[in-house]
Amino acid sequence: MMEILRGSPALSAFRINKLLARFQAANLQVHNIYAEYVHFADLNAPLNDSEQAQLTRLLQYGPALNSHTPAGKLLLVTPRPGTISPWSSKATDIAHNCGLQQVDRLERGVAYYIEASTLTAEQWRQVAAELHDRMMETVFSSLTDAEKLFIHHQPAPVSSVDLLGEGRQALIDANLRLGLALAEDEIDYLQEAFTKLGRNPNDIELYMFAQANSEHCRHKIFNADWIIDGKPQPKSLFKMIKNTFETTPDYVLSAYKDNAAVMEGSAVGRYFADHNTGRYDFHQEPAHILMKVETHNHPTAISPWPGAATGSGGEIRDEGATGRGAKPKAGLVGFSVSNLRIPGFEQPWEEDFGKPERIVTALDIMTEGPLGGAAFNNEFGRPALTGYFRTYEDKVNSHNGEELRGYHKPIMLAGGIGNIRADHVQKGEIVVGAKLIVLGGPAMNIGLGGGAASSMASGQSDVDLDFASVQRDNPEMERRCQEVIDRCWQLGDANPILFIHDVGAGGLSNAMPELVSDGGRGGKFELRDILSDEPGMSPLEIWCNESQERYVLAVAADQLPLFDELCKRERAPYAVIGDATEEQHLSLHDNHFDNQPIDLPLDVLLGKTPKMTRDVQTLKAKGDALNRADITIADAVNRVLHLPTVAEKTFLVTIGDRTVTGMVARDQMVGPWQVPVADCAVTTASLDSYYGEAMSIGERAPVALLDFAASARLAVGEALTNIAATQIGDIKRIKLSANWMAAAGHPGEDAGLYDAVKAVGEELCPQLGLTIPVGKDSMSMKTRWQEGNEQREMTSPLSLVISAFARVEDVRHTLTPQLSTEDNALLLIDLGKGHNALGATALAQVYRQLGDKPADVRDVAQLKGFYDAMQALVAARKLLAWHDRSDGGLLVTLAEMAFAGHCGVQVDIAALGDDHLAALFNEELGGVIQVRAEDREAVEALLAQYGLADCVHYLGQALAGDRFVITANDQTVFSESRTTLRVWWAETTWQMQRLRDNPQCADQEHEAKANDADPGLNVKLSFDINEDIAAPYIATGARPKVAVLREQGVNSHVEMAAAFHRAGFDAIDVHMSDLLGGRIGLGNFHALVACGGFSYGDVLGAGEGWAKSILFNPRVRDEFETFFHRPQTLALGVCNGCQMMSNLRELIPGSELWPRFVRNHSDRFEARFSLVEVTQSPSLLLQGMVGSQMPIAVSHGEGRVEVRDDAHLAALESKGLVALRYVDNFGKVTETYPANPNGSPNGITAVTTENGRVTIMMPHPERVFRTVANSWHPENWGEDSPWMRIFRNARKQLG
């Protein structure tokens, strides 16, 4: 039976206004829209009055419901029938944890009530199309239609393909019907194999074969034999990549054989809780570094949010499934798309060439895709710290003559680093009889055929198959699985995981054969043991679907009880679905039908399928010399600063958490003005050291339109000039991931790909001492469509994205582009040696040209000398600032440095030649260093020692003020206000934020950037930062116990434990399942801290589901109430813990006036480094800090204080319960965005109880308790930041 319960309003006023404007623009006469959430409960038994009241209260969250009866025509948007939304999975979990077992499933829709003039049926279809994502949702016309969401079908049987009867044609038909993308020789192979076996293949077997042998999974092109211009080539592409490892194996621990590559890290204190006692402590051991970079291009073109989200999620799983289990740590992300054409902000180089109907626009991708990628990382708890963004789309004269080149099929890049124990780097042995396990969520009828679909050019597959290959994301589930993996690797030698892989393309049909095959075993499986939410799925759908957040593992039978205990504690679902066998055979039994859908020798599935041969021709681009007739430097500056590749990327940065883990030493945002210009990302290796890891990206795809090999060399060079900003030492410490995107089969591209791979694999990387131990290829970068009577194609440039990873010697020595105005000198290191080529530059692009001669690596020895010289200068602390030269050239390098320093620049470029346009806009490798004036000679001498004398040019200096002046022999070449340039540079991000977020907030942020008087972040302290007030109490040897409380989805508990640990506490890991299960009580604890993250993925209101699981469980409710009433206890709630505790007001004495925390005013997750002031309040944790102003990490989507009315706010203020407020850089309490990131009244962001024993706050002091973890800080701070005082206050209070 289904019950319907109304929910809160679903759209803010500005979202409704945006919808109305879209309808008006489409000439649809819609006058008014009201939207509210509607909940549908699928019940297995009726609820009594008390249970009904409980369910009703559970579903009350968000803004108060409007009591009126809505007017207008109803359009109900729900998830597509046959799918289960991530919201449903999490909300149903909460209901069950609150004791509502009669609820089989909760689902949510949005009821739109549309008041409109008379519209035709077609116009109503247009209205409906604007309201839903056709890939994920459907539209009903009545609330009761939602019953279709809960219809259960009978299991479907396996179906066979009559190969023996119909011959080869049966396989050809199945290939088309199932979207298998099989090649002719693979069809021959299958015909032969099954004829030999003497039986017909089942659909599930063909599907499994297609996924396992797709280009996506098998990398056929990279393993192919090559004939170029009639000459056989000696090596495959993959062999040339492997050559880098053969030449430079140094520091590599694992390459080419696992889900990620591993290199040597540093010996540090890894901080985690003991399995038996729950007590956190440091464990001194090597923390080796793993690295992986994936792409998720096809799904992102079809449905950008889930496409990018599952792209990030899949890469995170790759890291966790490395060796015998590892820990993902920090991420990177990248996008290449066609022109944005922002409505009302179209740029002169943007022409509309059309697109296929089934893929979305570049603007849609960049509106939704980055949000999906960020949301997954945020909810999982991994900071995303670097990335790139390129737009390109034009008709150009390239290798194949004049044709359309661009990214209608986008690149969505997801990568990152993690850590792994030394004894877990290599996978273990799968013993015969080992239990084969699926860890993670249930099978769902989604994401079918992703591997094969992504191997086709967009436009080749059937529209319904595109629908089928879209996936859905549930990062909170992946977090639970990762917590299990963490518990396993933390056991060291007792780790129950023998072997682990992630489930990705092809689902279990790819993952399970890979697991047993890699372990030298076979497998015997039972289909119906696989967890499934949809009983009507066929065997093919159960075995081959790509439901995310799953891992496959082998665990020895005697270790199963331990594994079961770990999973139950973390509430991570798992199923034992088979046993490892001696014989390398794969069998899948179906209990329901008592048959065998799969019964195959593994070598048929994974054996030597026909090897591909590529017989290709070389084509050379002629290009056209740059026509400079109408180009002035002033106009060029304006245009280039508006090119999205160059322009400010704040809209891509502040949506992503950049502080979780407490180990982020360098994020994108630089300096007191938080300008997104960092060259690389840096993390600390642990919470007790200054060793670390660095990541950077290099990418110069447009250059491939003129010279394939140069483009590849420049990508490596740029990654190197970016990562050189931190202290690494030996260049051999740097390891690269190479992600290759190409339109295989397009004239000239295959030979060009071979050239590019050879240039880096056989030549450049070996010469530099660089290794490429990991990478990926995507070989179908083309879209085809019909535009009127014309057949069109959009082909991407050959695109190599290089990600560089390295161990860092001392994270404190990382340079940024932030200029200093002390007596200084700016020096250009020009690795282009005066070539100043303008082909395929940003300048050429904004004038709709390609040019003829591009930049290149001009001298490999000098590139190596540059890196070594930079390392010597960084270690000697001789540099004040560094920024590489890249898209936009020297002009952009200097401008971004001035933006970061909020200062002026006076430079002279006479030494760079007479061609000022080329000097300013060429994109040759190199960059600008800033040195103290007195160090200039010594620095120049050192650069000369490394062979760079002819590359170094004195430019001028940074000055206080607002002028950006470039001269040549004292004649003005360009002069402008730095603030004006800053505003131009910011306009793209402003327009994107206006479209995507609350336009009022976007306008306020843009206005703030135009304020030259802004002093930037600053610090005023009312206490001595160097005084450790906890020291006398620590000296007694007593360590009070603090319960570090977490719920499923919480992700900030480790750094919280470390902060309390440093202040003299014993931090104990306490999961809500421990309390609910009665394994632990709160009676033994002196302090309680509820940590940040996304409990239950923030469904049913941020923190509200967590709170209700306490309030609706009588025993646990008593436990909390008793703790809060006990004298001599302390409690802290941060972020999600703050939201949760604000919903426990009925249990906490003196908290009656506390507010609720609701959706940010911007309607967006906000990750900021915000300035706050400590106000006078009873809070015991903030004693002695009153009046201090200092920046703090902020990361939340629902942090806006909501009070009942003005009287409530006045009472909260008059009682003095406000503990922290947001202030602007002038020190004034503010409600203006982004200084106040959520719009809270009176800047309120922390409150306390009347006795001061319980304090709750939205910002994260635990993430910045170490100075090194602050995005910016005064130079004179030591190891501890001022926020350490909170934790020391706690220790002092407990005596």
Swiss-Prot record:
Chain positions recorded as ATP binding sites: 307-318, 386-388, 678, 886
UniProt KW keywords: ATP-binding, Cytoplasm, Glutamine amidotransferase, Ligase, Magnesium, Metal-binding, Nucleotide-binding, Purine biosynthesis
GO biological process: 'de novo' IMP biosynthetic process
EC number: 6.3.5.3
Compartments, as annotated in UniProt: Cytoplasm
InterPro entries linked to this entry: Class_I_gatase-like, FGAR-AT_N, FGAR-AT_PurM_N-like, PurL_large, PurL_linker, PurM-like_C_dom, PurM-like_C_sf, PurM-like_N_sf
Gene Ontology cellular-component annotations: cytoplasm
SUPFAM superfamilies: Class I glutamine amidotransferase-like (SSF52317), FGAM synthase PurL, linker domain (SSF109736), PurM C-terminal domain-like (SSF56042), PurM N-terminal domain-like (SSF55326), PurS-like (SSF82697)
Pathway where this protein functions: Purine metabolism; IMP biosynthesis via de novo pathway; 5-amino-1-(5-phospho-D-ribosyl)imidazole from N(2)-formyl-N(1)-(5-phospho-D-ribosyl)glycinamide: step 1/2
Cystine pairs: none
GO MF term (any one): ATP binding
Residues annotated as catalytic: C1135 (nucleophile), H1260, E1262
Catalytic activity from the UniProt record: N(2)-formyl-N(1)-(5-phospho-beta-D-ribosyl)glycinamide + L-glutamine + ATP + H2O = 2-formamido-N(1)-(5-O-phospho-beta-D-ribosyl)acetamidine + L-glutamate + ADP + phosphate + H(+)
Gene3D superfamilies: 3.40.50.880, Phosphoribosylformylglycinamidine synthase, linker domain, PurM-like C-terminal domain, PurM-like, N-terminal domain
Amino-acid positions noted as binding Mg(2+) in the UniProt annotation, renumbered to this chain: D679, E718, N722, D884
Record region (Disordered): 305-327
Record domain Glutamine amidotransferase type-1: where: 1042-1295
Family (UniProt): In the N-terminal section; belongs to the FGAMS family.
NCBIfam families for the chain: FGAM_synt (TIGR01735), PRK05297.1 (NF003672)
Assembly information from the UniProt record: Monomer.
Function: Phosphoribosylformylglycinamidine synthase involved in the purines biosynthetic pathway. Catalyzes the ATP-dependent conversion of formylglycinamide ribonucleotide (FGAR) and glutamine to yield formylglycinamidine ribonucleotide (FGAM) and glutamate.
PANTHER family named in the record: PHOSPHORIBOSYLFORMYLGLYCINAMIDINE SYNTHASE
Name the UniProt record assigns to this protein: Phosphoribosylformylglycinamidine synthase
